[in-house]
């Protein structure tokens, strides 16, 4: 689980969050629109929409923005977004998974391929790296939800597989298929989660040096800056010394 904390800390480093936040609301709105379009526009009847709204609220997205994104799904002239997954390789033989919501597959594929190439990586075929990741559910809580023992006990009772706690919060992992059931059980014991989502968790991490880590960060930053890209996952890890430099 150490790789999860490391990746999160590197991606959430100082100076990066302002750049990410400027695009965050539009990405969250797109997920809400897609979720509302895929089912009923009522979050009580649409699990995906309920989670999308919950995650948007966790990022302090205004209610007006959320309502507008839901209404957009009902519009006759609203865009149709496709869910696309790209898989590729970064510096040092690292694996990268990119999830996107796009209204133009050709544009997004071209942009993603270009970003990989410029960073010294390569876009692969679907399935080329995802076999080395597990698609799991992740439920996060702030530290205020309780101490590590309380959260661990609640997670076990809810049917979760693992819990990781650090200075930022609690990260509960469960089977992807059980995400709705586990999150509902946790809500009964710990209250509403900060985020509930499906993630790609690397089975094994690939150690890289500082130079390759810097290149990987630039690659991932460029991917995240693309309007169509929703999530990026990788399997690299660095030493504690390098982590301290990268997170500064």
Swiss-Prot record:
It holds the Pfam family Transcrip_reg. It is found in: Cytoplasm. GO terms for cellular component: cytosol. The keyword Transcription applies. Transmembrane segments: none annotated. GO terms for biological process: regulation of DNA-templated transcription. Its main location: cytoplasm. Keywords: Cytoplasm, DNA-binding, Transcription, Transcription regulation. InterPro entries: Integrase-like_N, TACO1_YebC-like_2nd/3rd_dom, TACO1_YebC_N, Transcrip_reg_TACO1-like, Transcrip_reg_TACO1-like_dom3, YebC-like. The keyword 4Fe-4S does not apply. GO terms for molecular function: DNA binding. Coiled coil: none annotated. Belongs to the TACO1 family. This is Probable transcriptional regulatory protein RHE_CH03475. The lineage of its organism: Bacteria, Pseudomonadati, Pseudomonadota, Alphaproteobacteria, Hyphomicrobiales.
